[in-house]
Amino acid sequence: MPRHHAGGEEGGAAGLWVKSGAAAAAAGGGRLGSGMKDVESGRGRVLLNSAAARGDGLLLLGTRAATLGGGGGGLRESRRGKQGARMSLLGKPLSYTSSQSCRRNVKYRRVQNYLYNVLERPRGWAFIYHAFVFLLVFGCLILSVFSTIPEHTKLASSCLLILEFVMIVVFGLEFIIRIWSAGCCCRYRGWQGRLRFARKPFCVIDTIVLIASIAVVSAKTQGNIFATSALRSLRFLQILRMVRMDRRGGTWKLLGSVVYAHSKELITAWYIGFLVLIFSSFLVYLVEKDANKEFSTYADALWWGTITLTTIGYGDKTPLTWLGRLLSAGFALLGISFFALPAGILGSGFALKVQEQHRQKHFEKRRNPAANLIQCVWRSYAADEKSVSIATWKPHLKALHTCSPTKKEQGEASSSQKLSFKERVRMASPRGQSIKSRQASVGDRRSPSTDITAEGSPTKVQKSWSFNDRTRFRPSLRLKSSQPKPVIDADTALGTDDVYDEKGCQCDVSVEDLTPPLKTVIRAIRIMKFHVAKRKFKETLRPYDVKDVIEQYSAGHLDMLCRIKSLQTRVDQILGKGQITSDKKSREKITAEHETTDDLSMLGRVVKVEKQVQSIESKLDCLLDIYQQVLRKGSASALALASFQIPPFECEQTSDYQSPVDSKDLSGSAQNSGCLSRSTSANISRGLQFILTPNEFSAQTFYALSPTMHSQATQVPISQSDGSAVAATNTIANQINTAPKPAAPTTLQIPPPLPAIKHLPRPETLHPNPAGLQESISDVTTCLVASKENVQVAQSNLTKDRSMRKSFDMGGETLLSVCPMVPKDLGKSLSVQNLIRSTEELNIQLSGSESSGSRGSQDFYPKWRESKLFITDEEVGPEETETDTFDAAPQPAREAAFASDSLRTGRSRSSQSICKAGESTDALSLPHVKLK
């Protein structure tokens, strides 16, 4: 778009950008009027604005007559001629001619398109004209044939001359109309486009036929005798009129498509047939050239071969010798089959192509129903209650339109009589009365300056509608009315002819005028239309032939297989894949993959739950066996261990499937297996660890004191206010019932006390008693016996224990280590049920060094470190005693309170104590023991 910043004295051209403030000052206060086209409506309505008063830049849409200041009248006159002009999206008029020329251009283009379709794309009655032209051409051909017969030469020549005159006129007019009507196509517009159209093959044929006809007629009329030879040659050119019958070239396109589709088969047949022709002709020529003069040359043999193999058989040349006849018969049988192949290939190709075209036409019939169905679906969707579409209701607002106020002023009484019953009812409604009142009040809302200047100028400007609150800020909810915006000066305004539509619609009708019941009715109608369109579309989907049925069946079968496969994939994702492989290696690989990757399917989860349930069942069975065997011991052991409370087993969270038999203590089992230690850490529970070894009741078991106990023990500072606890080994029972041996050692742990108990005395350190150890050589195992002594006895024992610990530290003596040893031939390890052994079957050995003790235990029981027995205290009341925790492996101790009662070891059956004779011992009473 050209842009030019004009001053006050310059004349504005079409499409100029002008600064209205400066232009108004230079022109003596004249104001610019800007016409803005309603692009969406496509009509000649102009919206006026008063931007000139604000000093904004305006786009002038006038012609050269549009000027500044005093040229406002020229602008008005030019804009009056622009009433019907269409505007582009950039605000530029699409047509610069008057409305009459626009209408003429529309008619011109319409006629041009119509004639082009009649001549190039005939439909309906247009075939009548083409049939007439065909009869003319065919009649001309017949007369040309009769003109060569001597008996009919005179009559045929005279009729042919008249017919050729008619043909020249018809073909000449048709050729000119074809060239002119081709301008409706974009590629054929202009003189270059016309030349491009004239170079088409059929236009070239028309030109040749027209020139030949003119030459023949001119030669006949002049009676030139020397032009007879030329006329005979031009007659052939007139035969080309038959070629132009198929203007669109559908026949040639069909033939070309068939030949192209079967080109390989045709080339193969023609190639083999040509080889047979060459060989047969040459062999017959060699045999017949001496005996038969008809085959004197190879060309004569080729002629004979062609006529014979094409099954024509003129009979002008025939072989005479028997050898030549045998060769011709053999090659005829072979060659005729290949020469006949192209005819069959082309015939089948034409049949298939015709059938395909029929199917294509059948499928093309589905386009309109499919488009109608899509349209109905969209309209039904857009009319939904939750839809925010505005445009979908606009087609239904036409029924609410009323005539413009201008037409009502011309004759309201006469127009009311011509109104239909529906319009009278609508106008009688409250909505119609409000529309009437708004239309009547248009003149009252006009500005005074407009009324004053309306008398002196031919134009008349109105103010815009004063919309109500509903549609004032919602212009998209109302129809685009043709009301202009107010302009202060009437000199730059446009006439009322630009203000109103061609239809004169002047009503303010919005989407909100459609009441909910009306919208509901519209939705119902659209739903019914949708169902009707769907039914019609289904009717067009009926199969055309058996091939379509097979294709539909195969497509449906393929879709079903895809859906089944998708369903199976989803089921496998939910339930897991239950693959059963015959190969062992592949099965192992699959199991390894399942172990490495977490299977989140339902099958994997079920398997995981089953494994965990089996592990829990095995653990519970083991614990129940232990509990039963402990209760079956003697009276003393029963009294001592009957108070053990075995709660339900609590599975470790770090391992999902490992049983207590397979669990390993990775923290320190490799170095500290079979050793007693005093743990003093404040974060981990305290406990006494007993290491159970695989043994039999008849075999001798040796317990060795490991020196690692001394190095791993941790001293606890003891204050005077704290209590003390003494742990010593003691034998419990001499008699034990025989019980089955467990497969692996078991870990038994007593949980620590609650941290809520704070002010309790601390225990004493663990010290061995050599005398007690000698007396307890024949004991089965060790247990804890709680003694109720006073504070003085506990303090005296604490002092002695301190001195003994110092002596152990100085001399490097070992602490007590309970390391059972049995021969290696035992296949199973003993459980807790073998904790109590008879004194006659067990011997305790004291190892002098750490290496000997640990080496002996490792030699006899290399796998013993995998299982341990932990006994810890559970909750105790404020008046009950609490036990310290002793571990064979180094474990940190939790902060806990200890009871004032001390613990010491003793024998339950013999009631003999390893400690001092004056100390009073009680039976083992551990009311809160928990397996963990």
From Swiss-Prot:
InterPro entries: Ion_trans_dom, K_chnl_volt-dep_KCNQ, K_chnl_volt-dep_KCNQ_C. GO terms for biological process: potassium ion transmembrane transport. A 1,2-diacyl-sn-glycero-3-phospho-(1D-myo-inositol-4,5-bisphosphate) binds at residues 248, 264, 361. Each channel subunit contains six transmembrane segments (S1-S6) with S1-S4 forming one voltage sensing domain (VSD) and S5-S6 contributing to form one quarter of an interlocking pore-forming domain (PD). The CALM binding domains correspond to the first two membrane-proximal helical regions that interact with a single calmodulin/CALM molecule forming a clamp-like structure and are essential for channel trafficking and electrophysiological activity. CALM N-terminus binds to the second helix in both calcium-free and calcium-bound forms and regulates channel trafficking. CALM C-terminus binds to the first helice in calcium-free form; this interaction is disrupted by calcium binding which regulates channel electrophysiological activity. Residues 370-378, 521-528 are annotated as: Interaction with CALM. It catalyses: K(+)(in) = K(+)(out). This is Potassium voltage-gated channel subfamily KQT member 5. Residues 1-125, 178-200, 253-266, 347-932 are cytoplasmic. Strongly expressed in brain and skeletal muscle. In brain, expressed in cerebral cortex, occipital pole, frontal lobe and temporal lobe. Lower levels in hippocampus and putamen. Low to undetectable levels in medulla, cerebellum and thalamus. Residues 404-465, 655-678, 876-919 are annotated as: Disordered. Phosphatidylinositol-4,5-bisphosphate (PIP2) is essential to activate KCNQ5 channel by inducing the coupling of the voltage-sensing domain (VSD) and the pore-forming domain (PD). Calcium suppresses KCNQ5 channel current through calcium-bound CALM C-terminus. Therefore CALM acts as calcium sensor that controls channel activity. Activated by niflumic acid and the anticonvulsant retigabine. Inhibited by barium, linopirdine, XE991 and tetraethylammonium (as homomer). Insensitive to tetraethylammonium in KCNQ3-KCNQ5 heteromers. It holds the Pfam family Ion_trans. The modification Phosphoserine is found at residues 88, 447, 831.
